[in-house]
């Protein structure tokens, strides 16, 4: 159900322009990332149970850096970094927020949340992307985007609350 909600959300676009403005290749890349994520989620949880969160985070950051370095070298168009307050804040955000803090929070979540729940929460990523675009960038929601958000929320709530309700009734 959440997958249908994401599809409706993507199809909505700005002013209901829809799928014409969306790259099919980009959507396939996101779908591939989701499939890979689902495939390694349980394995990652088992690894984190055997090693410390700090060790796992360190290895993840180093391996992530090594595997993305060739793409960075090939795809970077401009190597100029503005050494002003905005440029330095951007570098700090990328170094701390998107790297270290993101991995640390992810590993803390893996230690405390069941793999099934974390898999469901991944469906909320596009929803938060849209909400941040609306609140921070002043984007507007189309009807189909709002419908997609509603379906994603209902699927997420249903998959997390329904097992608890069924467990109480038994």
Curated annotation (Swiss-Prot):
Family the UniProt entry places it in: Belongs to the EamA transporter family.
One Pfam family this sequence matches: EamA
InterPro entries, alphabetized: AA-Vitamin_Transporters (IPR050638), EamA_dom (IPR000620)
Membrane-crossing segments per the record: 21-41, 55-75, 86-106, 117-137, 143-163
Full protein name: Uncharacterized transporter HI_0976.1
Keywords: Cell membrane, Membrane, Transmembrane, Transmembrane helix, Transport
Main subcellular localisation: membrane
Its membrane topology: Multi-pass membrane protein
Subcellular localization, as worded in the UniProt entry: Cell membrane
Entry keyword annotation includes Cell wall biogenesis/degradation: no
The organism's place on the tree of life at top rank: Bacteria
Family matches, as PANTHER family: EAMA DOMAIN-CONTAINING PROTEIN, INNER MEMBRANE TRANSPORTER
Leader sequence residues: none
Chain ranges of the EamA domain: 35-161
Single GO cellular component term: plasma membrane
Entries under SUPFAM superfamilies matching the protein: Multidrug resistance efflux transporter EmrE
């Amino acid at each position: 159900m959440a997958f249908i909600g994401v599809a409706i959300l993507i199809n909505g676009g700005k002013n209901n322009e829809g799928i014409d403005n969306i790259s099919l290749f980009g959507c396939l890349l996101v779908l591939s990332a989701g499939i890979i994520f689902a495939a390694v989620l349980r394995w990652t949880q088992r690894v984190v149970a055997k090693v410390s969160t700090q060790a796992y985070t360190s290895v993840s950051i180093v391996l992530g850096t090594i595997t993305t370095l060739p793409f960075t070298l090939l795809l970077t168009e401009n190597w100029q970094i503005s050494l002003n307050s905005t440029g330095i804040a951007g570098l700090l955000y990328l170094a701390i927020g998107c790297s270290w803090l993101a991995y640390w929070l992810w590993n803390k979540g893996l230690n405390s949340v069941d793999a099934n729940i974390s898999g469901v929460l991944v469906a909320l990523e596009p929803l938060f992307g849209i909400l941040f675009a609306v609140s921070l960038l002043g984007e507007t929601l189309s009807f189909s985007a709002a419908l997609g958000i509603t379906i994603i929320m209902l699927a997420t709530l249903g998959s997390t609350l329904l097992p608890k309700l069924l467990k109480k009734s038994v």
